[in-house]
Amino acid sequence: MQQAANREAFEARLRAVGEARYHDKHPFHQQLHGGQCSMIQVRAWVINRYYYQSRIPMKDAAFLSRCEDPQLRRAWRNRIEDHDGGVDEGGGIRRWLKLAEAVGLDPDYVASTRGVLAGTRFAVEAYVHFVREKPMLEAVASSLTEMFAPAIHANRIAGLIEHYAFANDSALAYFRQRLNEAPKEVAFGLNYVLDHADTLEKQDASVAALTFKTDVLWSQLDALSHAYVSPGLIPPGGWDGREGVIS
């Protein structure tokens, strides 16, 4: 019977998932960060990515609802606050809607989630279901894509500033804030997984959970590319390039 890898080897195995599969390598992101997206494509990305953003606190609430460890609950609930903010201000969702406004979309239209691609919905709901139903260790492991997020946020900020007129401080506030928030979340989540994946079976399951999450992120961009880049076939119910545009 094979033994579990030591912490260093196991962490390296987790990080290798991101090196091979994280969505910073997707052609759509390379196009976006390189200034090669039209405003229709940028807006379609903002609309569809909002659906993912809006479901993250719901995913985390589902996680907390079955978490019996108060220490874990105390650490995890900050994630909901990071995305939802306070009663009147703050939070990643509000900051994403500022981006929507900056690219010329009605924030109320974006928040309605009308026009979100079916492929986006299926991928995001699969993630929420995964976190709601899978063992706690796997649910935490699926969040470890945040290990790879700071680099993509930094590249995105630089690329948007260089190539797009809308990229002001207000528009980029979401990404700048995540540069501060994500490392804190990663530190806790990674330590939790390294501490609790104490058998090879649990390590394999953790790697599979992280791989699943990279598939969730990648498949959203596949749906977006198919609809708005090539072949450019917008499916029924997908944003038509006009609705909700205010400038």
UniProtKB/Swiss-Prot annotation:
Reactions this protein catalyses: 6-(2-amino-2-carboxyethyl)-7,8-dioxo-1,2,3,4,7,8-hexahydroquinoline-2,4-dicarboxylate + 3 O2 = pyrroloquinoline quinone + 2 H2O2 + 2 H2O + H(+)
Pfam families given in the database record: TENA_THI-4
GO terms under biological process: pyrroloquinoline quinone biosynthetic process; sulfur compound metabolic process
Enzyme Commission number: 1.3.3.11
Coiled-coil ranges per UniProt: none
Associated pathway: Cofactor biosynthesis; pyrroloquinoline quinone biosynthesis
Keywords (A to Z) from UniProt: Oxidoreductase, PQQ biosynthesis
Classification via Gene3D superfamilies: Heme oxygenase-like
Any GO molecular function: pyrroloquinoline-quinone synthase activity
Keyword Transmembrane helix: no
Physiological role: Ring cyclization and eight-electron oxidation of 3a-(2-amino-2-carboxyethyl)-4,5-dioxo-4,5,6,7,8,9-hexahydroquinoline-7,9-dicarboxylic-acid to PQQ.
Family (UniProt): Belongs to the PqqC family.
UniProt name for this protein: Pyrroloquinoline-quinone synthase
Source organism (scientific name): Rhizobium rhizogenes (strain K84 / ATCC BAA-868) (Agrobacterium radiobacter)
